[in-house]
Regions:
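An active-site-proximal structural segment forming one wall of the substrate-binding cleft
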Residues: 1-17
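Beta/alpha (TIM)-barrel catalytic core signal, keyed to glycine-rich beta->alpha loops juxtaposed to Asp/Glu
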Residues: 7, 26-215
């Protein structure tokens, strides 16, 4: 199945190699399989991905999640970054190509920045801090929540951060969170592209300023 989907993607894009290949929402299989069978299945999927790397079809792989890294241990759908890395090591050894994770992060869904859900060497860290500690790159999805949060921001919020629009302020929050490598944001108009490029020219907000937004 993974090989078929990868070949479809390569054909649709007209490419010979993808920079990154994500397994999408694997946590949806946890309830059906149970933890042990789930992580065994993940290792087999990672073995397939290592084969794709060896064949030159992808350069790296990861997991794109919605709930998996945000919910705490013991809650349905929780994914352990440490166990995923163990699976990657079993699939590809120390030089495995499991390099990225994706999770939602925005002003309305700040869990990845605020809530410790991942145990790393006996310490429970936020998903972003855990990814940093484990050497993983992070993409954020829903960085401005498909614009649904923009009308909920208080008057003057954008101006307080030296920005023109609520969308810029929302994106600046997400891209500034320590550990975020890439903040994904869909753009349907050229004007939105220009608006977001303005944000990229600014320095990121300090962690203290980010934390102050949540009291």
């Amino acid at each position: 199945y993974l090989a078929h989907q990868l070949d479809l993607s390569l054909g649709a894009l007209g490419l010979g190699t993808l920079d990154l290949f994500h397994l999408h929402n694997p946590e949806q299989q946890l309830a059906h399989l149970g933890p042990e069978a789930f992580y065994a299945a993940i290792q087999r999927a990672f073995e397939a991905c290592e084969g794709f790397v060896a064949a030159g079809k992808i350069r790296a792989y990861g997991v794109a999640t919605w709930n998996g890294f945000r919910v705490p241990p013991g809650q349905a759908g929780h994914l352990s970054l440490a166990r995923l890395l163990n699976a990657a090591g079993g699939a590809g050894g120390r030089d495995h190509h499991f390099r990225w994770i994706q999770l939602p992060l925005n002003l309305a869904m700040p869990e990845a920045f605020l809530i410790p859900t991942q145990e790393v060497d006996g310490t429970v860290l936020t998903p972003l801090a855990a990814a940093q500690a484990l050497g993983l790159q992070v993409q954020t999805s829903a960085s401005i929540m498909q614009a649904r949060i923009l009308n909920q921001l208080p008057d003057g919020f954008a101006a307080a951060f030296g920005l023109r629009t609520p969308a810029q302020a929302a994106l600046q929050f997400t891209r500034s969170c320590p550990g975020v490598s890439t903040a994904l944001c869909g753009m349907g108009q050229a004007a939105h592209v220009a608006e977001n490029i303005e944000v990229m020219a600014l320095p990121k907000l300090a962690p203290e300023a980010l934390g102050s937004l949540f009291g």
